[in-house]
A protein has these predicted regions:
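Glycine-centered hinge/linker elements that transmit conformational signals in sensory
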Residues: 84, 126-157
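Ligand-binding "clamshell"
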Residues: 10-18, 45, 92, 114-115, ...
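Hinge/lid segment of periplasmic solute-binding proteins
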Residues: 3-57, 81, 107-109
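Extracytoplasmic/periplasmic substrate-recognition and gating elements
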Residues: 64, 68-69, 143, 150, ...
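Short, solvent-exposed loop/beta-turn-alpha elements that line the ligand-binding surface or hinge
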Residues: 20-33, 72, 99, 115-140, ...
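A structural signal for short loop-to-beta-strand junctions that line the ligand-binding cleft
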Residues: 28-64, 93-94, 198-208, 284-290
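C-terminal capping/gating helix-and-loop segments adjacent to ligand/active sites or protein-protein/ligand interfaces
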Residues: 259, 272-328
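Extracytoplasmic/periplasmic solute-binding protein
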Residues: 43-51, 57, 81-130, 173
Length: 331
């Protein structure tokens, strides 16, 4: 299982099998948004089969806790802090967070998208444009991101993401910024979407979508029967049956467009609608926090800089910008 820019790195080494004949026979170009199929290709040839789509920019909330606190679900960051204040006054932890660098980075990604918008996100966190990384918008993103920390609890450092989700499930906390793998925790606890928990786009990101697509690449093999088995597997992975069963179990959605969604829950239906809409509007964007947007060396360095800022009280947003801009040069 290789994904994102790592696919290009492996393909460059010449070890991945070309899947063009399967892709052509199965019409992958028509069944996938271009931004996704481009990631599955190297020099114009398919080298991977996409399995699913996880949406990263979600906010999960406990509606009962919100109601008791007299708070309303936020649609932008100003409203987020108003809700957080109300939750804090009601004696609950406003934001369930696990202080691990990838969770900090996941939060940062949603703040960057919500404060800066899709074009800013693309320039700063996909193209790593130096001017955008040091812009006034980036400073506002970092200031907003750091403010979120004020509404997390002191036991957050080192906490696993699923334990943070459990805090929202049991009413200890009001909300969590996390990708749609969090949904599996709610469902496993017997909770019903729209009733016991709510899934809304992270503040300010309703018209945008950061994706994390898992994919399978096949290594080049010499043997005919094995090559055929690889092709059959690739075709099956993109087939409607696998796409439905796999994603119903994983909490993600089918990557294949125009799939019937009647067996899926409301969160998945929203995710699919937004996936299709943003693929047309240009706001379907690769997740930097989940290995989809930039080479792994740059991702790791930026992630470390973001966490350092989150964890260092004395560091200013300007210092963090310099560190992130320097980190972006790591290729």
């Amino acid at each position: 299982q290789i994904k994102g820019p790592s696919l290009q790195e492996w393909a460059h080494e010449g070890v991945l099998a070309n899947m063009d004949d399967v892709a052509k026979a199965e019409h992958w170009d028509e069944l996938l948004p271009k931004v996704v199929s481009d990631i599955m290709k190297y020099q114009g040839h398919y080298i991977a089969a996409p399995v699913n789509v996880h949406r990263v920019n979600w906010l999960w909330a406990n509606p009962e806790v919100f109601q008791k606190a007299g708070a309303k679900l936020p649609t932008n960051w100003d409203e987020f802090f108003v809700a957080a204040e109300a939750l804090k006054k009601a004696g609950v932890i406003p934001v369930a967070h696990g202080g691990q660098n990838w969770q900090d980075f996941t939060t940062f990604e949603s703040v960057a998208l919500g404060v800066g918008g899709p074009d800013f996100y693309k320039k700063a966190l996909v193209q790593l444009d130096p001017a955008t990384l040091k812009s006034a918008t980036m400073e506002k993103v970092l200031t907003t991101f750091k403010k979120v920390k004020d509404y997390t609890d002191k036991n957050a450092p080192g906490r696993d993401w699923n334990l943070a989700t459990a805090m929202v499930i049991n009413g200890q906390a009001g909300m969590q910024l996390m990708g749609d793998w969090a949904k599996g925790e709610f469902l496993a606890a017997g909770k019903v979407p729209g009733k016991d928990f709510v899934c809304v786009a992270a503040p300010g990101t309703a018209k945008a979508y950061t994706f994390n697509v898992d994919s399978f690449a096949m290594f080049k093999l010499k043997d005919g029967p094995n090559q055929q088995a690889q092709k059959d597997l690739a075709a099956a992975i993109m087939g409607p049956q696998f796409q439905e069963v796999f994603n119903l179990n994983k909490g993600s959605i089918p990557v294949r467009l125009n799939m019937p969604m009647d067996k899926f829950d409301d969160c998945a239906k929203t995710s699919t609608k937004d996936f299709v809409d943003t693929s047309k509007s240009g706001a379907l964007l690769p997740s930097i926090a989940h290995g989809m947007a930039v080479p792994s060396a740059a991702e790791g360095a930026i992630k470390d800089a973001v966490s350092q800022f989150w964890n260092t009280d004395k560091m200013t947003a300007k210092d963090a910008m310099d560190k992130i801009a320097a980190a972006a040069k790591m290729h």
